[in-house]
Design a protein with these regions (language model features):
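Pocket-edge structural micro-motifs
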Residues: 41, 116, 138, 296, ...
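Short, solvent-exposed loop/turn segments at the edges of secondary structure
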Residues: 32-34, 39-44, 64, 129-131, ...
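Short Gly/Pro-enriched turn/cap motifs at secondary-structure boundaries
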Residues: 58, 124-126, 260-263
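Acidic/histidine-rich catalytic neighborhood
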Residues: 19-79
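Active-site core of glycosidic bond-cleaving carbohydrate-active enzymes
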Residues: 1-6, 11-15, 62-239, 243, ...
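Non-catalytic C-terminal accessory modules of carbohydrate-active enzymes
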Residues: 26, 186-336
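Short conserved micro-motifs at the rims of enzyme active sites and ligand-binding pockets
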Residues: 50-52, 147, 283
Length: 336
Protein backbone atom coordinates (compact mmCIF):
# COMPACT_ATOMS: atom_id res chain seq x y z
CA UNK A 1 0.00 0.00 0.00
CA UNK A 2 1.29 3.44 -0.87
CA UNK A 3 -0.67 5.41 1.75
CA UNK A 4 -1.96 2.72 4.17
CA UNK A 5 -5.48 4.11 3.78
CA UNK A 6 -7.46 1.16 5.15
CA UNK A 7 -10.84 2.73 4.43
CA UNK A 8 -9.94 3.04 0.75
CA UNK A 9 -8.60 -0.51 0.79
CA UNK A 10 -11.74 -1.91 2.41
CA UNK A 11 -14.35 0.00 0.42
CA UNK A 12 -12.72 0.44 -2.98
CA UNK A 13 -9.45 -1.33 -3.67
CA UNK A 14 -10.07 -4.74 -2.09
CA UNK A 15 -13.46 -5.36 -3.74
CA UNK A 16 -11.86 -4.54 -7.10
CA UNK A 17 -8.83 -6.72 -6.42
CA UNK A 18 -11.00 -9.58 -5.21
CA UNK A 19 -13.18 -9.53 -8.31
CA UNK A 20 -10.05 -9.55 -10.48
CA UNK A 21 -8.62 -12.48 -8.56
CA UNK A 22 -11.92 -14.37 -8.71
CA UNK A 23 -12.00 -13.93 -12.47
CA UNK A 24 -8.45 -15.23 -12.84
CA UNK A 25 -9.10 -18.23 -10.59
CA UNK A 26 -12.10 -19.10 -12.75
CA UNK A 27 -10.35 -18.44 -16.06
CA UNK A 28 -6.96 -20.07 -15.44
CA UNK A 29 -6.40 -23.79 -15.90
CA UNK A 30 -3.80 -26.38 -14.98
CA UNK A 31 -1.61 -27.13 -17.99
CA UNK A 32 -1.52 -30.96 -18.21
CA UNK A 33 1.97 -30.81 -19.74
CA UNK A 34 3.61 -29.31 -16.66
CA UNK A 35 0.95 -28.84 -13.92
CA UNK A 36 1.40 -25.06 -13.86
CA UNK A 37 -1.58 -22.73 -13.45
CA UNK A 38 -1.81 -20.80 -16.71
CA UNK A 39 -3.89 -18.37 -18.72
CA UNK A 40 -4.70 -18.84 -22.35
CA UNK A 41 -5.03 -18.58 -25.14
CA UNK A 42 -3.61 -15.13 -24.49
CA UNK A 43 -1.17 -12.61 -25.96
CA UNK A 44 1.85 -10.49 -25.18
CA UNK A 45 0.21 -7.22 -26.27
CA UNK A 46 0.55 -6.42 -29.98
CA UNK A 47 3.57 -8.70 -30.39
CA UNK A 48 3.93 -12.06 -32.10
CA UNK A 49 6.28 -15.02 -32.46
CA UNK A 50 7.30 -17.61 -35.03
CA UNK A 51 6.49 -21.30 -34.68
CA UNK A 52 6.90 -24.00 -37.31
CA UNK A 53 7.44 -21.43 -40.02
CA UNK A 54 4.35 -19.33 -39.24
CA UNK A 55 3.65 -16.17 -37.25
CA UNK A 56 1.29 -16.35 -34.26
CA UNK A 57 0.22 -14.05 -31.43
CA UNK A 58 -1.80 -16.30 -29.08
CA UNK A 59 -0.32 -18.89 -26.75
CA UNK A 60 -0.70 -20.30 -23.27
CA UNK A 61 0.60 -18.12 -20.42
CA UNK A 62 2.65 -15.34 -22.00
CA UNK A 63 5.02 -13.94 -19.40
CA UNK A 64 3.06 -10.70 -18.93
CA UNK A 65 0.06 -12.75 -17.76
CA UNK A 66 2.22 -14.50 -15.20
CA UNK A 67 3.40 -11.11 -13.94
CA UNK A 68 -0.10 -9.68 -13.65
CA UNK A 69 -1.63 -12.81 -12.10
CA UNK A 70 1.08 -12.84 -9.43
CA UNK A 71 0.58 -9.15 -8.65
CA UNK A 72 -3.20 -9.45 -8.41
CA UNK A 73 -3.08 -12.58 -6.26
CA UNK A 74 -0.37 -11.15 -4.00
CA UNK A 75 -2.05 -7.76 -3.56
CA UNK A 76 -5.35 -9.47 -2.83
CA UNK A 77 -3.70 -11.82 -0.33
CA UNK A 78 -1.98 -8.93 1.43
CA UNK A 79 -5.32 -7.12 1.60
CA UNK A 80 -7.04 -10.09 3.27
CA UNK A 81 -4.30 -10.10 5.91
CA UNK A 82 -4.53 -6.35 6.54
CA UNK A 83 -8.34 -6.41 6.74
CA UNK A 84 -8.51 -9.83 8.47
CA UNK A 85 -11.14 -11.15 6.06
CA UNK A 86 -11.80 -14.06 3.68
CA UNK A 87 -9.46 -16.65 5.20
CA UNK A 88 -10.52 -19.49 2.89
CA UNK A 89 -10.24 -17.24 -0.16
CA UNK A 90 -6.75 -16.28 0.99
CA UNK A 91 -5.83 -19.98 1.09
CA UNK A 92 -6.94 -20.37 -2.52
CA UNK A 93 -4.74 -17.42 -3.48
CA UNK A 94 -1.71 -18.97 -1.76
CA UNK A 95 -2.32 -22.21 -3.63
CA UNK A 96 -2.67 -20.38 -6.93
CA UNK A 97 0.56 -18.44 -6.39
CA UNK A 98 2.43 -21.67 -5.65
CA UNK A 99 1.32 -23.09 -9.02
CA UNK A 100 2.40 -20.18 -11.22
CA UNK A 101 5.29 -20.97 -13.57
CA UNK A 102 8.69 -19.41 -12.90
CA UNK A 103 10.32 -16.83 -15.12
CA UNK A 104 12.53 -18.32 -17.79
CA UNK A 105 15.65 -17.06 -19.52
CA UNK A 106 15.70 -17.40 -23.30
CA UNK A 107 18.53 -18.89 -25.31
CA UNK A 108 19.21 -15.31 -26.45
CA UNK A 109 19.92 -14.35 -22.83
CA UNK A 110 16.81 -12.24 -22.28
CA UNK A 111 13.67 -12.83 -20.24
CA UNK A 112 11.34 -15.10 -22.22
CA UNK A 113 8.33 -13.17 -23.48
CA UNK A 114 6.28 -16.33 -23.86
CA UNK A 115 6.10 -19.55 -21.85
CA UNK A 116 7.87 -21.38 -24.66
CA UNK A 117 11.13 -20.01 -26.03
CA UNK A 118 9.65 -18.92 -29.33
CA UNK A 119 11.54 -16.97 -31.96
CA UNK A 120 10.58 -13.29 -31.90
CA UNK A 121 8.77 -12.25 -35.08
CA UNK A 122 9.52 -8.58 -34.43
CA UNK A 123 12.73 -8.09 -32.40
CA UNK A 124 12.35 -4.32 -32.87
CA UNK A 125 8.89 -4.21 -31.28
CA UNK A 126 7.96 -1.23 -29.09
CA UNK A 127 6.21 -3.36 -26.45
CA UNK A 128 8.14 -5.00 -23.61
CA UNK A 129 5.17 -6.08 -21.52
CA UNK A 130 7.03 -9.01 -19.96
CA UNK A 131 9.29 -6.45 -18.25
CA UNK A 132 6.41 -5.27 -16.10
CA UNK A 133 8.18 -7.71 -13.79
CA UNK A 134 11.06 -5.22 -13.53
CA UNK A 135 9.00 -2.02 -13.46
CA UNK A 136 6.57 -0.98 -12.06
CA UNK A 137 6.53 -4.27 -10.15
CA UNK A 138 9.50 -5.79 -8.35
CA UNK A 139 9.34 -9.47 -9.24
CA UNK A 140 12.74 -8.97 -10.86
CA UNK A 141 15.26 -6.92 -8.86
CA UNK A 142 19.02 -6.52 -8.69
CA UNK A 143 19.12 -7.80 -5.10
CA UNK A 144 16.57 -10.63 -5.09
CA UNK A 145 16.96 -12.04 -8.60
CA UNK A 146 20.33 -10.97 -10.04
CA UNK A 147 20.29 -13.49 -12.89
CA UNK A 148 16.84 -12.36 -14.00
CA UNK A 149 17.94 -8.73 -13.68
CA UNK A 150 20.83 -9.55 -16.01
CA UNK A 151 18.36 -11.17 -18.40
CA UNK A 152 16.09 -8.11 -18.24
CA UNK A 153 19.05 -5.93 -19.21
CA UNK A 154 19.72 -8.27 -22.14
CA UNK A 155 16.10 -7.94 -23.26
CA UNK A 156 16.42 -4.14 -23.20
CA UNK A 157 19.74 -4.17 -25.04
CA UNK A 158 18.40 -6.45 -27.77
CA UNK A 159 15.37 -4.22 -28.28
CA UNK A 160 17.44 -1.05 -28.51
CA UNK A 161 19.99 -2.66 -30.84
CA UNK A 162 17.39 -4.13 -33.21
CA UNK A 163 17.18 -2.58 -36.65
CA UNK A 164 14.44 0.08 -36.78
CA UNK A 165 13.49 -0.28 -33.11
CA UNK A 166 10.09 1.34 -32.64
CA UNK A 167 11.24 4.28 -30.54
CA UNK A 168 7.96 5.84 -29.40
CA UNK A 169 7.49 8.29 -26.56
CA UNK A 170 6.16 5.66 -24.15
CA UNK A 171 8.60 2.91 -25.14
CA UNK A 172 11.44 5.38 -24.54
CA UNK A 173 9.92 6.40 -21.19
CA UNK A 174 9.81 2.71 -20.30
CA UNK A 175 13.55 2.58 -20.87
CA UNK A 176 14.03 5.33 -18.29
CA UNK A 177 12.04 3.29 -15.77
CA UNK A 178 13.80 0.02 -16.60
CA UNK A 179 17.30 1.48 -16.42
CA UNK A 180 16.40 3.26 -13.17
CA UNK A 181 15.54 -0.09 -11.59
CA UNK A 182 18.80 -1.51 -12.92
CA UNK A 183 20.60 1.54 -11.45
CA UNK A 184 22.19 2.32 -14.79
CA UNK A 185 22.32 6.10 -14.56
CA UNK A 186 24.10 6.68 -17.88
CA UNK A 187 21.53 4.83 -19.97
CA UNK A 188 18.60 6.16 -17.95
CA UNK A 189 19.82 9.71 -18.53
CA UNK A 190 20.36 9.04 -22.23
CA UNK A 191 16.72 7.97 -22.52
CA UNK A 192 15.63 11.11 -20.66
CA UNK A 193 17.49 13.15 -23.28
CA UNK A 194 15.92 11.19 -26.13
CA UNK A 195 12.44 11.60 -24.67
CA UNK A 196 12.81 15.34 -24.12
CA UNK A 197 14.57 15.78 -27.46
CA UNK A 198 13.33 14.07 -30.59
CA UNK A 199 10.17 12.71 -28.94
CA UNK A 200 8.86 16.01 -27.50
CA UNK A 201 7.60 19.24 -28.99
CA UNK A 202 8.32 22.81 -27.89
CA UNK A 203 5.47 22.68 -25.37
CA UNK A 204 7.00 19.51 -23.83
CA UNK A 205 4.16 17.30 -25.07
CA UNK A 206 5.52 13.89 -26.06
CA UNK A 207 4.69 12.35 -29.43
CA UNK A 208 4.52 8.97 -31.11
CA UNK A 209 6.50 9.39 -34.36
CA UNK A 210 4.93 8.95 -37.77
CA UNK A 211 5.52 5.58 -39.38
CA UNK A 212 5.26 3.45 -36.24
CA UNK A 213 2.23 1.17 -35.82
CA UNK A 214 0.66 2.63 -38.95
CA UNK A 215 0.65 6.26 -37.80
CA UNK A 216 0.56 8.64 -40.76
CA UNK A 217 1.92 11.56 -38.77
CA UNK A 218 3.22 12.39 -35.31
CA UNK A 219 0.60 11.74 -32.62
CA UNK A 220 0.48 13.45 -29.24
CA UNK A 221 0.49 10.81 -26.52
CA UNK A 222 0.42 11.88 -22.89
CA UNK A 223 1.77 8.57 -21.60
CA UNK A 224 5.28 9.68 -22.52
CA UNK A 225 4.90 12.66 -20.20
CA UNK A 226 3.53 10.66 -17.29
CA UNK A 227 5.85 7.66 -17.67
CA UNK A 228 8.83 9.94 -18.23
CA UNK A 229 8.07 11.80 -15.01
CA UNK A 230 7.70 8.48 -13.20
CA UNK A 231 11.04 7.33 -14.56
CA UNK A 232 12.82 10.48 -13.42
CA UNK A 233 11.25 10.07 -9.97
CA UNK A 234 12.50 6.47 -9.94
CA UNK A 235 16.03 7.71 -10.66
CA UNK A 236 15.81 9.90 -7.55
CA UNK A 237 13.88 7.67 -5.14
CA UNK A 238 13.02 3.98 -4.97
CA UNK A 239 10.96 2.22 -2.31
CA UNK A 240 10.05 -1.28 -3.48
CA UNK A 241 10.70 -4.28 -1.21
CA UNK A 242 10.12 -2.09 1.88
CA UNK A 243 13.48 -0.40 1.33
CA UNK A 244 13.76 3.33 0.66
CA UNK A 245 16.80 4.41 -1.34
CA UNK A 246 17.73 8.01 -2.08
CA UNK A 247 19.43 8.85 -5.39
CA UNK A 248 19.64 5.21 -6.55
CA UNK A 249 20.28 6.13 -10.19
CA UNK A 250 21.75 9.63 -10.21
CA UNK A 251 23.57 10.60 -13.43
CA UNK A 252 26.74 12.66 -13.22
CA UNK A 253 24.94 15.46 -15.06
CA UNK A 254 22.69 15.93 -12.01
CA UNK A 255 25.48 16.15 -9.43
CA UNK A 256 23.71 19.04 -7.64
CA UNK A 257 19.97 19.27 -7.12
CA UNK A 258 16.91 18.77 -4.97
CA UNK A 259 13.40 17.40 -4.96
CA UNK A 260 10.34 17.97 -2.79
CA UNK A 261 7.29 15.89 -2.02
CA UNK A 262 8.22 12.56 -3.61
CA UNK A 263 6.23 9.75 -1.99
CA UNK A 264 7.60 6.37 -0.96
CA UNK A 265 5.54 3.23 -0.51
CA UNK A 266 4.01 2.79 2.92
CA UNK A 267 3.34 6.42 3.75
CA UNK A 268 6.52 8.50 3.58
CA UNK A 269 6.87 11.92 1.91
CA UNK A 270 10.44 12.99 1.21
CA UNK A 271 12.29 16.24 0.50
CA UNK A 272 16.00 16.00 -0.31
CA UNK A 273 18.92 18.02 -1.63
CA UNK A 274 22.38 16.94 -2.73
CA UNK A 275 25.75 18.33 -3.75
CA UNK A 276 28.50 16.52 -5.65
CA UNK A 277 26.13 13.55 -5.93
CA UNK A 278 25.81 13.14 -2.14
CA UNK A 279 22.76 13.80 -0.01
CA UNK A 280 23.35 16.86 2.20
CA UNK A 281 19.85 17.19 3.63
CA UNK A 282 16.74 15.02 3.64
CA UNK A 283 13.44 15.16 5.51
CA UNK A 284 11.21 12.09 5.73
CA UNK A 285 7.63 12.77 6.85
CA UNK A 286 5.51 9.82 7.96
CA UNK A 287 1.89 10.04 6.81
CA UNK A 288 1.14 6.70 8.51
CA UNK A 289 2.83 4.42 11.06
CA UNK A 290 5.62 2.62 9.23
CA UNK A 291 8.66 0.40 9.66
CA UNK A 292 11.16 0.29 6.81
CA UNK A 293 14.79 0.06 5.85
CA UNK A 294 16.74 2.96 4.38
CA UNK A 295 19.72 2.59 2.08
CA UNK A 296 22.01 5.61 2.34
CA UNK A 297 25.70 5.78 1.47
CA UNK A 298 28.02 6.92 4.28
CA UNK A 299 25.14 6.89 6.77
CA UNK A 300 27.46 7.36 9.76
CA UNK A 301 28.56 10.77 8.46
CA UNK A 302 25.11 12.27 8.99
CA UNK A 303 23.39 13.97 11.89
CA UNK A 304 20.01 12.29 12.48
CA UNK A 305 17.05 13.91 14.24
CA UNK A 306 13.60 12.48 14.87
CA UNK A 307 11.09 15.22 15.65
CA UNK A 308 14.02 17.62 16.29
CA UNK A 309 15.60 15.28 18.86
CA UNK A 310 18.89 13.46 18.29
CA UNK A 311 18.28 10.03 16.83
CA UNK A 312 20.79 7.17 16.73
CA UNK A 313 19.93 4.91 13.79
CA UNK A 314 20.52 1.17 13.78
CA UNK A 315 22.98 0.70 10.94
CA UNK A 316 23.52 -2.95 10.03
CA UNK A 317 26.60 -4.54 8.49
CA UNK A 318 24.93 -4.54 5.08
CA UNK A 319 24.61 -0.74 5.28
CA UNK A 320 20.84 -0.75 5.71
CA UNK A 321 19.28 1.44 8.39
CA UNK A 322 16.21 0.09 10.18
CA UNK A 323 13.70 2.80 11.07
CA UNK A 324 10.29 2.91 12.78
CA UNK A 325 8.11 6.03 12.61
CA UNK A 326 4.68 7.03 13.84
CA UNK A 327 2.20 9.06 11.84
CA UNK A 328 3.28 12.70 11.89
CA UNK A 329 6.93 11.97 12.70
CA UNK A 330 9.66 13.89 10.88
CA UNK A 331 13.10 12.37 10.40
CA UNK A 332 15.84 14.80 9.36
CA UNK A 333 19.14 13.65 7.90
CA UNK A 334 21.81 16.30 7.40
CA UNK A 335 25.55 16.61 6.86
CA UNK A 336 26.82 18.49 9.97
Amino acid sequence: MITQDKDFLKNTAYPLLKSNAEFLLDYMVIDPRNNYLVTGPSISPENSFRHQGQEFCASMMPTCDRVLAYEIFSACLQSTEILNVDASFADSLRTAISKLPPFRISTNGGVQEWFEDYEEAHPNHRHTTHLLSLYPYSQITLNKTPELAKAARKTIERRLAAKDWEDTEWSRANMICFYARLKDSENAYNSVKQLLGKLSRENMFTVSPAGIAGAGEDIFAFDGNTAGAAGIAEMLLQSHDNCIELLPCLPKEWKNGNFKGLCARGGIEIDASWKNSQIVNAVLKATAPIEFTLRLSNAKLYCWKLNKKTFIPKIKDDGLIYISMNKGDNLTIIIP
